Regions:
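Small-residue-rich transmembrane alpha-helices
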Residues: 169-170, 257-320, 351, 361, ...
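Hydrophobic alpha-helical transmembrane segments of multi-pass inner-membrane transport and secretion
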Residues: 199-234, 261-262, 266, 337-362, ...
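Short, small-residue-biased leader/transition segments that mark boundaries at the very start
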Residues: 1-3
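Intracellular coupling helices
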Residues: 219-260, 320-331, 588-627, 687-696
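Membrane-helix entry/capping segments
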Residues: 165-212, 231, 245-246, 275-298, ...
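Mid-to-C-terminal secondary-structure elements
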Residues: 48-60, 74-198, 396, 400-563
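N-terminal Sec/SRP start-transfer signal
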Residues: 316-347
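Membrane-proximal juxtamembrane linkers immediately C-terminal to transmembrane helices
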Residues: 15-19, 58, 118, 290, ...
Length: 697
């Protein structure tokens, strides 16, 4: 079960019959670990002593219930311990967190599988942060803490949910309900991830894509098989005349399908090995985990279904045809099977093309849309320089570098959003949560932010707000000299900053409070001169030399923005891959259909030409035959893509404008490709001497 806030311990204490264990953890300590001078990047959590018991993680060495009650203690995953110490015993080894805190390794635990949402390689004891006064682990705060509880087998979870709000009232002051409000409940850990709106949305869309690709590919194979009946009918007839029964004929087709699928699987294996990085990036999981034994039934079941549909359907059609009709009935074009299959292919390709167009358009839209600040050539690094003297030295050092254009700092940066604070009215009633950040006076100018009116705050009693804050407060156009009640602080509005993007464009525009600081550090921002990449390397090297006792890693802000849309990029790549795949699948099916139609109707076409029909008329007849199927299919496919695009775009606060004309153009392009393919395959027979066709008859 997963819950938020500091309630885990209280639940365990008050529900001993239902709850077996409970734990709280946070992910603040995200800086690197060091063993000597060697740096290690690893996922870390700061947790209490019942973390392993609650989460059901196997402890390989050490006693976490005892050791994690001490400060400056760490437990390492078996993977990280081997990476750090090779075959040496890790117990008792001392490592460093961010070159600031020495941590003693007191135990190891089993590696956590990739499919876990909580997958730390290091668990640091909770007293490590308590002893330094970091965070707010109290009943009046601490919303950055995540808590889990483990129920006893057979426990009634509804008992806990029914009494949970009353339990919280015992610990939280009564005025908190009025000021900030709260709701407490327990929820299965599996549902926490699966029921996130973005996860559900992407799961539905990717499921639709996968089903469409598999379904159309299978139907395409069936279509090609059925299209081949005319020239394979004699062979089947010979087999039947030689005594082969329906089962034998069906078995022949199943064997043929099995051989084709086997070669397809071998080709797939080669593709997986040669494009491993791309595939793992797209699926966000290693191939070993994707095809692990406990999940292997999924691809095996998929292959089995494809085998049954692709082999059994055309096989049964042949097997059930009487010998007396084999040579006669299938010398004519039989479209009853082929047209519906072709319809599905056309609709599927139109759907994926419409989806691909909007996904790519939205991805490049959010990457290039004005953010309200200028991230070009800006790099950021999180570090604390300590006292004022060291801060001044660091500021002077960075400003003195010849390849640095400007320098400033703030508590954080806008790419990953800011911390929040509750805003109240004069009576203390909670209104909403606002983002806030302390910035040096020159920071907005350095970042290209626009101060619409007023000035920067100069002391702790002054703030600047953004436009959205004024809108949420319903203050109209008169924003200066207003009073802000901010979690117990009363401040005067002295400036209004133009809205800028906080987080990425999947987040709605949030209200924002800007406060002043004269301290240099926390999140250092540097705008470099060109050449950017070369100067970034220089900056990181000289920073490491100038501050050897600190971790000073500058990262490109533009790259961070791109990474914040990584899931969108992956989805865009997936839709492109799906569209290209389905385009070629459709082309194979259409070519097979057209070739078969031309073969069947060669005598008809020859007679029409003998009677005076022009080549253009023949081509028009064949094109119309396909368009009867294609037009309706493409319209349905494009309409379906519009619906799914609308569902996908709900995850963004800002949408790229897409008019109906774009969907019409997508439909027209699809139809033009279909017509071009038909003309290409029909051109020879339409311009051929009709005598040749009549001779062959």
């Amino acid at each position: 079960m997963c819950i938020r806030d500091r309630v885990a311990g209280a639940i365990q204490e008050n529900f001993p019959k239902e709850v077996e264990a409970a734990t709280s953890y946070c992910v603040w300590m995200s800086a690197p670990l060091y063993y000597g001078s060697v740096r290690f990047e690893a996922n870390k959590v700061t947790a209490d002593s019942l973390f392993f018991q609650t989460m059901g993680i196997d402890v390989l060495s050490g006693v976490p219930e005892k050791e994690l009650m001490q400060k400056d203690v760490v437990f390492l995953s078996d993977r990280l311990a081997r990476k750090m110490f090779d075959q040496e015993n890790p117990i008792g080894k001392v490592i460093s967190y961010n070159k600031e805190i020495e941590l003693t390794v007191k135990g190891t635990y089993a590696d956590i599988p990739e499919n876990a949402t909580v997958r730390p390689d290091a668990v640091i004891s909770l007293p490590t942060v308590w002893s330094r006064g970091w965070g707010n682990y109290s009943w009046r705060g601490g919303d950055s803490w995540i808590a889990f509880i483990r129920f006893r087998p057979g426990a009634d979870k509804s008992v806990v949910n029914a009494r949970l709000n009353d339990l919280i009232k015992k610990y939280r002051p009564a005025e908190d309900q009025k000021v900030v409000g709260y709701t407490a409940f327990v929820k299965p850990i599996r549902d926490v991830y699966r029921e996130e709106p973005d996860v559900k949305r992407m799961r539905n869309i990717m499921s639709i894509l996968g089903i469409i690709i598999l379904f159309i590919a299978t139907l395409n194979y069936v279509l090609i098989s059925i299209s081949s009946l005319s020239y394979r009918a004699k062979a089947i007839g010979v087999h039947k005349c030689s005594g082969a029964g329906s089962g034998k004929i069906l078995g022949m087709f199943l064997l043929e399908t099995a051989i084709i699928i086997l070669f397809a699987l071998l080709l797939m294996g080669l593709i997986l090995l040669n494009f491993r990085d791309f595939i793992e990036d797209t699926t966000a999981v290693e191939l070993g985990a994707l095809f692990s034994l406990d999940r292997l039934w999924v691809p095996l079941l998929t292959v089995a279904i494809l085998f049954l549909i692709g082999g059994a359907l055309p096989g049964r059609i042949f097997a059930r045809i009487p010998v007396s009709q084999v040579f006669r009935r299938y010398t004519e074009g039989k479209k009853g099977w082929k047209r519906p299959l072709l319809f599905v292919q056309f609709a599927g390709v139109a759907f994926i093309c419409g989806l691909m167009y909007v996904v790519m358009l939205q991805y490049y839209y959010v990457l290039n849309k004005d953010l309200g600040y200028n991230p070009k050539r800006v790099v950021v690094a999180n570090t604390d320089f300590g006292n004022k003297e060291n801060q001044d030295y660091a500021l002077t050092f960075f400003r003195g570098l010849p390849y640095v254009e400007s320098v400033s700092s703030a508590d954080s940066h806008p790419v990953y959003s800011y911390s929040g604070t509750m805003i109240q009215d004069e009576s203390g009633q909670s209104l909403f949560s606002s983002r806030f950040c302390e910035m040096m006076e020159d920071y907005p100018k350095m970042m290209g932010m626009v101060m619409k009116e007023g000035r920067m705050p100069r002391n702790e009693n002054e703030v600047a707000i953004n436009e959205t804050y004024g809108e949420w407060m319903h203050w109209g156009t008169e924003l200066l000299n207003r009073t802000v009640y901010n979690s117990g602080y009363v401040c005067k509005v002295v400036g209004v900053i133009k809205d800028f993007r906080i987080g990425n464009f999947t987040n709605p525009q949030a209200p924002f409070i800007l406060m002043s600081t004269k301290n240099f550090g926390n999140c250092v921002h540097v705008r470099l001169k060109e050449p950017f990449a070369e100067n970034l390397q220089k900056l990181n090297k000289v920073s490491a030399d100038a501050f050897p006792d600190k971790t000073v890693d500058f990262r490109s802000m533009e790259q961070m923005i791109k990474e914040s849309y990584n899931s969108i990029r992956v989805f865009s790549n997936a839709t492109i891959l799906a569209a290209v795949t389905m385009f070629f699948v459709m082309m194979m099916g259409l070519i097979g259909y057209t070739t078969d139609e031309v073969r069947h109707r060669s005598k008809e076409i020859a007679i029409r030409k003998v009677n005076g029909a022009e080549a253009s008329g023949i081509l028009e007849m064949l094109v119309k035959d396909v368009l009867y199927v294609a037009v309706a299919a493409v319209v349905i496919g494009v309409a379906a893509s519009w619906y799914v695009n609308d569902m996908w775009m709900d995850m963004f606060a800002e949408h790229v404008p897409v008019s109906w004309a774009a969907y019409v153009l997508i439909a027209i392009v699809n139809l033009l490709v279909i017509v071009a393919c038909v003309l290409w395959k029909s051109w020879r027979i339409a311009n051929e001497n009709p005598v040749n066709s009549l001779k062959s008859e």
